[in-house]
Amino acid sequence: MDKLAIQASPPLAGDVIISGAKNAALPILMAGVLAETDFVVSNVPNLRDVSTSCKLLRCLGADVDELGEGKIRISTKNLNEFCAPYDLVKTMRASILILGPLLARYGTADVSLPGGCAIGARPVNLHLHGLEMMGAKIEVKEGYIKARVDGRLKGAHIFMDMVSVGATENLLMAAALADGETVIENAAREPEVIDLANCLIAMGAKITGVGSATLRIQGVERLQGCEYRVMPDRIETGSFLVAAAVTRGRIRCLKADPASLESVIAKLEDAGAKITTGEDWIELDMEGKRPKAVNIKTAPYPGFPTDMQAQFCVLNVLAQGTATITETIFENRFMHVPELIRMGATMELEGNTCIIQGIESLSGAQVMATDLRASASLVIAGLVADGKTIVDRIYHLDRGYEHIEQKFQGLGAHVERVQ
């Protein structure tokens, strides 16, 4: 099984090209099921979850051609299966996003209950409740969600009890082909939801309120394929910016989207980073200084993203001062803390808050990745730890970061993949 071996590295320096956003690419690939003609998606990152999504679409009978350079073509003319099996779904929570498109277009879907990162309950009840309001008959048995609808789904007024990105995306896709108007209130406002909505509009969907907490979807008879480019990955961008800050370096993230990262950029500036942005690039310069501790509280967009929490834990571990990090989105999302403590970090958990006393340095150690973003934080910690750090179970990392060791090497980091 692959591991990453990391040696203490110099301050990161240079340019890094940001990949397409995993969390936008996955729902957009699932949206291909809604299209009656060929659908081409570009800027798709080469990741394990993307490969799993393509396998799932092929399992349903869709023709999926990987055209190279991050471009994928999907044709549904031979789609004739409506079951997303356990073997595929167990490795990736985003598989649940096939439910809405299958049900809306074909009236039937059997989807295994999902797997993915082990970071809390992430219930699917919001997805199911919304689809039931649109007329679906749903039962959960033998580990599968079995959904049926006679004719077409019907437009409905859906109020989400809590903000959920996945449920918003599933209901948005289902509503695009429903009969009549659907209103989704308390909808997620994440940039990836906006990207999906813009993709659906390019396919012929009628959606208003994009980017707000109230989405209005006027169902249409059919959707056509189009060519669509996935947005840049804001979490990958943020991860490299934090790595540069922790190593007191200076980097530029190219093909990035500064507008989607405002909360992260603000916290990096609070930590002492000098940040300059252009339309599609972000430069961070620590000017050789140690970062200052910053308090973080995660929140739905436009608040601070939960997917950047672990990386800022590492920043605060090596910062000047004491900080608190409060996680409000997922329970069980501090699994990186015991690993960082093994490297010498001074951290204490109190409920959903981590109290961190900044120290001068860490010690290299063998550590274990527990989920996608926790693994990124351990890599960043390894860059500034004395001696050698081995990060085990990096299949988590490969689910969300494209060519991570090559990108770090390009910035001067001592990182290599080993068996």
From Swiss-Prot:
Q: EC number(s) of the enzyme?
A: 2.5.1.7
Sorted alphabetically, the keyword list is:
Cell cycle, Cell division, Cell shape, Cell wall biogenesis/degradation, Cytoplasm, Peptidoglycan synthesis, Pyruvate, Transferase
Q: Which InterPro entries match?
A: Enolpyruvate_Tfrase_dom, Enolpyruvate_Tfrase_sf, MurA_subfamily, RNA3'P_cycl/enolpyr_Trfase_a/b, UDP_GlcNAc_COvinyl_MurA
Q: What Gene3D superfamilies does this protein map onto?
A: Enolpyruvate transferase domain
Which residues are phosphoenolpyruvate-binding?
A: 22-23
Q: Gene name, please? A: murA
Q: Name one GO molecular function term.
A: UDP-N-acetylglucosamine 1-carboxyvinyltransferase activity
Q: Taxonomic lineage per UniProt?
A: Bacteria, Pseudomonadati, Pseudomonadota, Gammaproteobacteria, Alteromonadales
Name by which UniProt lists this protein? UDP-N-acetylglucosamine 1-carboxyvinyltransferase
